[in-house]
Curated annotation (Swiss-Prot):
Residues 1-63 form a transit peptide. It is found in: Plastid, Chloroplast; Membrane. It comes from the Eukaryota. The keyword Membrane applies. This is Protein ABCI12, chloroplastic. It comes from Arabidopsis thaliana (Mouse-ear cress).
Length: 391
């Protein structure tokens, strides 16, 4: 029997699905600018195929670096911070070391150039002690006098650069110590019984308007203790740095060494090696100029090469900074070796007492010395009298 002619049995079943809730469109409404006519993005109905409803497709490509000619992009140089650029760092170093910091300025010649260096050292000691012991008015007066003296004595570009940096450092110290010394209020519990128990009226906090807290910034508070600590540190920093800079700018290293030797000479009777100390100080003051010159010349050499920092990686940039520091130390050690060889050629054998050191110092002006001593006495008298009248 041939079974190929027989038909296969089939069963047909009709199923009708009635949903309990109405079918909604799976849409994502996105309003326009006026928020009045919302539009539907990619409407998806049950009677449509996914290929027709999801025709638009957005492709996202994630890249870690910038592509270009098969090279790895330097993501550090593309940070939105312009101060992180290596070239900007080298330019700042070259400009900072370009101004004479702690160096003698021979011109223009001012009245401070003719003052005796021993009087200048006494002035330095006075300007260190007075701000720490005087009140706020005297401190601010000394700061203003030091700033005015810098403007009168130093060249314009020099005093602008120095005053800006010292003022920035002093301002940071004032804000930090002013808010940090007594900024967090202590959690104290009063031991005085309330007025309801003692049957005494509440007394005012102050009869003369005195207030310990001067300013309140959220959780921080600026008190009188913070004002005292911050002003003392800021004024001391400004006066010490700027007065030392003025002294070094108007006095040669030989004059400073001779003045310090005059003050330390009585210590030779108790065995203090004054000659070695003075020689070390003289060499240190002479060596400051060499250090600044080397830092400036090496940084300018790197800037003048016009290195394309955008194509360098982080390790390559760090390698350039390491070579920069290594080159500076190499040049400094070479200069130190040359100085030692020059001293040996001139007969120095390591004993300062047996080797004669000639201090070439110009003659001071008697009128300038007398005026400086009078000003010194006036400043000390004003600081002492302020403790009795300015309370």
């Amino acid at each position: 029997m041939n079974h190929s002619n027989l038909a296969n049995p089939t069963v047909s079943l009709t199923v009708t699905l009635i949903p309990k809730h109405p079918i909604r469109h799976l849409t994502s409404p996105i309003p326009n600018r006026n928020f009045t006519n919302p539009k539907l993005l990619f409407p998806l109905r049950l009677n449509e195929t996914p290929s027709s409803s999801l025709a638009a497709k957005r492709v996202f490509i994630v890249r870690a670096t910038v592509d270009g000619d098969g090279k790895t992009g330097n993501w550090v140089n593309r940070l939105p911070i312009p101060g992180l650029g290596a070239e900007n760092v080298f330019r700042l170093i070259s400009s900072a070391t370009g101004s004479p910091i702690g160096q003698f300025i021979s011109s223009p010649v001012t009245f401070l150039h003719s003052v005796d260096p021993r009087i200048k050292l006494v002035w330095l000691l006075t300007l260190v002690v007075l701000p720490a012991r005087a009140n706020l008015v005297v401190r601010l007066g000394l700061v203003l006098c030091t700033a005015l003296l810098s403007i009168l004595v130093l060249p314009r570009q020099v005093w602008i650069d120095q005053l800006a940096r010292v003022s920035l450092l002093s301002g940071i110290l004032f804000i930090t110590l002013g808010l940090g010394s007594d900024g967090a209020p202590p959690m104290l519990q009063s031991r005085t019984p309330p007025s309801s128990i003692t049957s005494l009226p509440n007394l005012p906090m102050s009869l003369s308007g005195y207030s310990y807290m001067l300013l309140k910034l959220g959780p921080l508070q600026f008190t009188r203790k913070g004002l005292s600590v911050g002003s003392t540190a800021a004024c001391l920093t400004f006066i010490i740095f700027q007065s030392a800079s003025i002294c070094l700018a108007t006095t040669t290293p030989e004059q400073l060494a001779l003045a310090l030797r005059w003050f330390l000479f009585p210590l030779t009777y108790i065995g203090v090696p004054v000659s070695e100390i003075i020689l070390t100080l003289l060499l240190s003051l002479r060596f400051i100029n060499l250090v600044f010159d080397e830092v400036r010349s090496v940084s300018l050499g790197i800037v003048s090469r016009r290195v394309n920092w955008q194509q360098l990686t982080v390790l390559e940039t760090l390698d350039i900074f390491a070579s920069f520091i290594r080159r500076i130390f190499k040049n400094i050690f070479r200069h130190a070796e040359q100085i030692s060889q020059a001293m040996i050629v001139r007969g120095f054998r390591g004993e300062s007492s047996s080797h004669k050191i000639y201090f070439f110092s110009g003659s001071s002006n008697k009128f300038a010395d007398f005026a400086s001593v009078l000003c010194l006495i006036g400043v000390i008298s004003t600081a002492l009298l302020s403790e009795y009248f300015l309370v």
